[in-house]
């Protein structure tokens, strides 16, 4: 049970059977994490460096907890205080880190493709923790695990992804993963927040929220990424919530057992009604956070197996 590639850079590189392999292992780690003794030894003796060029308390903490629960020596690199702020290039940084012989490198970067570039320059396993608008593979995997545990399957479901699609690497990774697993995907939101390459995605597009949610099994809301907008994308937050914010009235168009998701952090009263976000009968938002640790444990475990096998092969 392993992955074919040395790195986890995107969902686009994973085959359906690899997705299932990773989710099956993550399922076991999710159960382990609910026990009093949560620790495993899959990463014993390995060094994990978390290097985040964008702030992300949630994702960084999730990767740190995942690594420590499996026995890794975890270091969080403070990019703001590093040589990068003094003019060092990404390649210089990669080569410097490589000389220290880390085993796992977790990277988040504001530019699409930066993590792939870094992966070409190091000998360790690299995990993409989000790069620009490109991909966020572990978020899509944790969303998939959350869906599978809630619905009992991960195929032939109707999934609505709603909101700021254009600026969302989460949306792109989820579209790729859910498509590989034979689900029907709808994108719901204003035209100004739809990606230019929408015709290539193989999805249905709705500008009307109620029509887009009609009969769906899963409602996945996205954060309005105001920091990536120059203005003009939406008239106002109040108008956006009126048309595209998820509330009980709009959710009533989905199936009665439809689940509500959000990758966080949430803008309550903008993307989603706060009461609905906290509704334990419909919302699985806290389960997403929980599954994030399990998925990252599974991903690092599988990559570590490849790393150790490769090193054993060299020694042989």
Curated annotation (Swiss-Prot):
It comes from Dinoroseobacter shibae (strain DSM 16493 / NCIMB 14021 / DFL 12). The lineage of its organism: Bacteria, Pseudomonadati, Pseudomonadota, Alphaproteobacteria, Rhodobacterales. GO terms for cellular component: cytosol. Heterododecamer (2C3:3R2) of six catalytic PyrB chains organized as two trimers (C3), and six regulatory PyrI chains organized as three dimers (R2). InterPro entries: Asp/Orn_carbamoyltranf_P-bd, Asp/Orn_carbamoylTrfase, Asp/Orn_carbamoylTrfase_sf, Asp_carbamoyltransf, Asp_carbamoyltransf_Asp/Orn-bd. Its EC number is 2.1.3.2. Belongs to the aspartate/ornithine carbamoyltransferase superfamily. ATCase family. One of its GO terms (biological process) is 'de novo' UMP biosynthetic process. L-aspartate binds at residues 86, 169, 223. It catalyses: carbamoyl phosphate + L-aspartate = N-carbamoyl-L-aspartate + phosphate + H(+). One of its GO terms (molecular function) is amino acid binding. Keywords: Pyrimidine biosynthesis, Transferase. Catalyzes the condensation of carbamoyl phosphate and aspartate to form carbamoyl aspartate and inorganic phosphate, the committed step in the de novo pyrimidine nucleotide biosynthesis pathway. This is Aspartate carbamoyltransferase catalytic subunit.
């Amino acid at each position: 049970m392993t992955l074919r590639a040395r790195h986890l850079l995107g969902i686009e590189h994973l085959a359906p059977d690899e997705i299932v392999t990773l989710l099956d292992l993550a399922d076991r780690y999710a159960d382990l994490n609910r026990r009093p003794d949560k620790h495993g030894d899959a990463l014993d003796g390995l060094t994990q460096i978390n290097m985040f060029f964008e702030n992300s308390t949630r994702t960084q903490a999730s990767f740190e907890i995942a690594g420590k629960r499996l026995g890794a020596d975890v270091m969080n690199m403070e990019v703001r205080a590093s040589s990068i702020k003094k003019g060092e290039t990404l390649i210089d940084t990669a080569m410097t880190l490589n000389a220290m012989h880390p085993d796992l490198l977790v990277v988040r970067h504001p530019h699409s493709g930066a993590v792939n570039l870094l992966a070409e320059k190091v000998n360790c396993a690299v995990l993409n923790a989000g790069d620009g608008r490109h991909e966020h593979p572990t978020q899509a995997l944790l969303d998939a695990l959350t869906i599978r545990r809630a619905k009992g399957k991960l195929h032939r479901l109707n999934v609505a992804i709603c909101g700021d699609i254009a600026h969302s690497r989460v949306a792109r990774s989820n579209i790729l993963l859910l498509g590989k697993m034979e689900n029907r995907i709808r994108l719901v939101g204003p035209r100004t927040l739809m990606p230019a390459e929408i015709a290539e995605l193989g999805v249905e597009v709705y500008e009307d929220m109620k029509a887009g949610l009609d009969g769906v099994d899963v409602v996945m809301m996205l954060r309005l990424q105001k920091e990536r907008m120059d203005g003009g994308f939406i008239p106002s937050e109040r108008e956006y919530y009126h048309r595209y914010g998820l509330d009980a009235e709009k959710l009533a168009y989905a199936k009665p057992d439809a689940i509500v998701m959000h990758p966080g952090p949430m803008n309550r009263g903008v993307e989603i009604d706060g009461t609905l976000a906290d509704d334990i009968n419909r919302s699985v938002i806290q389960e997403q956070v929980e599954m994030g640790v399990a998925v990252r444990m599974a991903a690092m475990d599988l990559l570590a197996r490849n790393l150790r096998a490769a090193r054993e092969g060299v020694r042989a």
